[in-house]
Amino acid sequence: MDADINSIEWDAPIAPGVSMAAIPLHASFSDLDAVLATHLIDADAQLYRFEGGPDLRLERYGPDEHGNGGFLFSLPGDDLAGDMAALSITIEGWVVRALKVYALGLPPDIVAGKSYRGLAGGKVGLGSLVSDFLGFTELHFDEAEEWFCSGDDYGVLEISGWGVPLEDEPGQVVTAICVVA
């Protein structure tokens, strides 16, 4: 599996079980950290700008001695959205294990346009209908976690809507997407 990382892109496709934002699952922490350094625009404020994306503030968690930790990128507090999570990266054993993007409001909110714009299957992303994923994979609702999981045929993808089954709210929109190794 190719886990090279060269850039982080705010409109790169979502590849379930493979990558999101041009960040491959299984990329090494050191390679990711080196690429992150190229996107730093203000060291004092810990602001980063990815290709095609808004300015985001970074909070680092670890890594600890076992290589577990993560990164949380959020819109800065002075933005209309406040401190809204935009992208989280989970590191386990010194490699990327999960990538999650969050909707920053929904249209017509002005901040909705700052949300990650990558699409799965070339047509479904944040703000789309959850049911649009049914065009290329089964969805299983996890009652305990209150999210949808893709079918085995599609790769590991977790989709957040409104925390209820589609039968209860067929018009729910995608509020977060996570690719998992």
Language-model segments: residues:
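Short helix/turn-capping signatures at newly exposed starts of structured segments
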Residues: 1-181
